[in-house]
Regions:
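Short beta-strand-to-loop transition segments that serve as allosteric relay/switch motifs
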Residues: 62-65, 96, 104-107
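A small-molecule sensor/coupling module
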Residues: 4, 20-24, 86-88, 104-138
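Short acidic-glycine-tyrosine-enriched beta hairpin
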Residues: 65-77
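Short beta-strand His + acidic residue motifs that chelate non-heme Fe in jelly-roll/DSBH
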Residues: 60-61, 78-79, 89-93, 109
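Short, conserved catalytic or interaction motifs in soluble domains
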Residues: 72, 81-84
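Regulatory nucleotide-sensing modules
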Residues: 5, 9-63
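Helix-loop-beta junctions that constitute the ligand-sensing/allosteric loops
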Residues: 30, 84-90, 96-99
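ATP/adenylate-binding site constellation spanning eukaryotic-like Ser/Thr protein kinases
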Residues: 19, 55, 72-75, 96, ...
Length: 138
């Protein structure tokens, strides 16, 4: 659990949560291993998982073009936690990966059960959206 807590402390959605709150989040995550070449997300398909990379690298790509490569401490799929919407890009394991996964259902049960966490996470998501779409702000 210590390694899981250490990773969760670095994820912007959870930065600032205390250890007890992080333990609640950690209890809802699942650790998974994905071999090289595994598809984590496919562009234009509906998503419901948020991935946090423990080890390995993940290539983010759209229409075959690499957008960026993510590594340990990075995360992807945070918007799927909110809206179950279509993925805006694909994600493929470039190397063997070890990940923490938080599903849509678990995320919403967390927000329902922990109002303090809900406010913190929603503020963090708003910051993330602003970072991703600065040209659309009013």
């Amino acid at each position: 659990m210590d390694e899981k807590l250490a990773l969760l402390r670095t994820v912007p959605l959870f930065v600032g949560l205390d250890d007890d709150e992080l333990k609640v989040v950690g209890a809802l995550t699942t650790e998974v291993d994905k071999p090289t070449g595994s598809e984590l997300a496919r562009e234009e398909t509906f998503g419901s998982e948020f991935y946090m990379i423990i080890d390995g690298s993940v290539r983010i790509h759209r229409a075959g073009a690499t957008l960026r490569t993510l590594g340990p401490g990075d995360f992807l799929g945070e918007i799927a936690l909110i809206d179950h919407g279509r993925r805006t890009a694909s994600a493929t394991a470039e190397t063997d990966c070890r990940l923490l996964v938080l599903g849509h259902r678990e995320f919403h049960s967390l927000l329902d059960a922990q109002p303090d966490i809900r406010v913190h996470v929603l503020e963090a998501l708003a910051r993330r959206v602003r970072q991703l779409t600065p040209e659309h702000e009013v």
